[in-house]
Amino acid sequence: RFNKGEQIDILFISHFHEDHISGIPKLMKHCRIKRVVIPYIPKGDRVLFAYSNRDLAGYEELITNTENYFRNEAEIIRILPEEESEDNNNETRDEELTMPSGRSITATYIGVPIADWCFIPFNYNYAAKVKQLQVALKAEGLDHSKLDSVSYIKNNYDRIKNVYKNLSGNINDTSLVVFSGMHLNFIPYIFFSYQPGRYEMYKTGLNCIYYGDVNTDKDILYNRLMKRLQNLYATIQTIQIPHHGSKHNFRSTIINPGSISIVCTDSNHKKQYHPDPTVIVDIVNTGSFLHQVTDNVNSTLTEHGHY
């Protein structure tokens, strides 16, 4: 909950799905957003990405021209896919700031005076499916050179939609994952407060991980994440369960015993049976505390850290 006019130092957008971006316009009216982190999409692919899904109607500029969408008042950082990150440092591509996947963004970098706090975003090739779509559309006889034309995409939307449905995989599989926390040389304690019904608990460890809608059941993604975080993962005490608790995106080894597992759902996800009962059982069996955050403001979980 933010006060009117309050500054948000850094905003992470895990991926461009309506249920993950619909609150941004309201947030922009209510707060001042200083910095936004998004997955990198090549410029030539952004129009096809934005206009090949009608669920993104009204959010096209957020994808095609993010700087302009935020009225050029926020710094935009694009996280490169893993494949392009190995030999890259922070760089500017056509006046756009990019950063390698797995690179630490320190609190000092964003102007927040918290010692040793950092954010580590991961991008496992978020835009890969757009490339697959381009190849498949060309095979279907569509003009590849016009796939960056809004009118051409709209005129051929039904054909594009059918091809898109037949592609393997899911764009959720590669949404951003973000670690937020402190390095190993700090041992803080944490206090949780919940209203109404109020429960309080004290724990050591402030560190969090946000999985967005990513598929943690994919071995390559999971193994790369664990290799990067190594011993840091054991310090994580707050875990956002991927894809609203879907059993297709979950593996029980992402849960640390004694942690808080947060499942974010709204009324739409009840139709999809999220969270899945098997996910709930796995969370409880690991000794984690399950908390469900919904579109009801009273479900808010606030984390207060002291160190």
What is each residue range found by the language model?
Residues F2-I38, Q230-S246, S259:
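Active-site metal-binding motif and surrounding structural segment of the metallo-beta-lactamase
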Residues F16-I21, P42-D45, N215-D219, I241-F250, ...:
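Active-site environment of divalent metal-dependent phosphoester hydrolases
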Residues M28, Y202, R251-P257:
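Alpha-helix C-terminal capping segments
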Residues R35, K43-P113, Y222-M226, T253-Y307:
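Binuclear metal-ion centers of metallo-dependent hydrolases, dominated by the metallo-beta-lactamase
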Residues P39, Y211-G212, P242, C264:
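A cross-family glycoside hydrolase active-site/sugar-binding cleft signature
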